[in-house]
Curated annotation (Swiss-Prot):
The chain crosses the membrane at residues 112-132. Residues 176-214, 221-243 have a biased composition (Low complexity). It is found in: Cell inner membrane. Keywords: Cell inner membrane, Cell membrane, Cell shape, DNA-binding, Membrane, Signal-anchor, Transmembrane, Transmembrane helix. This is Cytoskeleton protein RodZ. Cytoskeletal protein that is involved in cell-shape control through regulation of the length of the long axis. It comes from Salmonella newport (strain SL254). Residues 1-111 are cytoplasmic.
Amino acid sequence: MNTEATHDQNEAQTTGVRLRNAREQLGLSQQAVAERLCLKVSTVRDIEEDKAPSDLASTFLRGYIRSYARLVHVPEEELLPGLEKQAPLRAAKVAPMQSFSLGKRRKKRDGWLMSFTWLVLFVVVGLTGAWWWQNHKAQQEEITTMADQSTAELNADKDSGQSVPLDTGAVTSQDTTPAQTAPAPATPVDSTAATQTQTPAPTAAATQNTVVAPSQANVDTAATSAAPAATETPSALPTSQAGVAAPAADPNALVMNFTADCWLEVTDATGKKLFSGMQRKDGNLNLTGQAPYKLKIGAPAAVQIQYQGKPVDLSRFIRTNQVARLTLNAEPTPAQ
């Protein structure tokens, strides 16, 4: 009778109450139980209060309760009914497995995306290369056109230069003809002398001899007078050279030094072309005209320009490798 009453009383007690009573009978504290089971004191307290922590799986909780029961000498079979209520087993949630075909489909999609990315990259690179080539070709054609124009202008200048000496020669021949025919007026004098004397033939021959002598003297005199004129001509050269060197003092003078072959065209404010053509390596060019100047340079890297005594910056054209087109303004004149 007493055994049945004790069994009913044990069934009435919960798992936590039975474990706490057994611990107290052994004289153990919650701290001692936690140290022996390697648990937290809060976990031991939750077990005795029949609480199931939300952050603790039911499998671990059932294991802790069994360890606690063995520690306080409580049969595990008596705690099984209470364990089902306090820590029921829960079915584990298993994530559905993805099929191999899904992964293959995703991999195929990623492959198409990568191929499209490479295609776009190749198109961009191709368009960039085509744009650069067209720009470079246009620059080369422009340089060739300007060079052809300058060559045509140089040929025209040569043709005009060859025709000028012909005119000069004609003028010279016209100028020298009167000098050579200047002694001609002496002939009427000879004829007059012949009619006045009316001497025999030997006398006339002597008269002719005397007439010829003055004509030779006149030719010698003309040659002698022409010689000082020829000697005086070089004395005028220093004056002309000084006149050519004088514009170098112009504050708007344009000085260019060439380190390589370069096509160049320089125009002043009046539209006059001061220079148009090809300059060779190590060449120098000094120009003077009415500012501002307009310059076209086929190879900016091959020329060094000084204007008003200061170097002209061509770095922006050199970096882009383009034909340089620039205008050099006139120097402001100081107030007097």
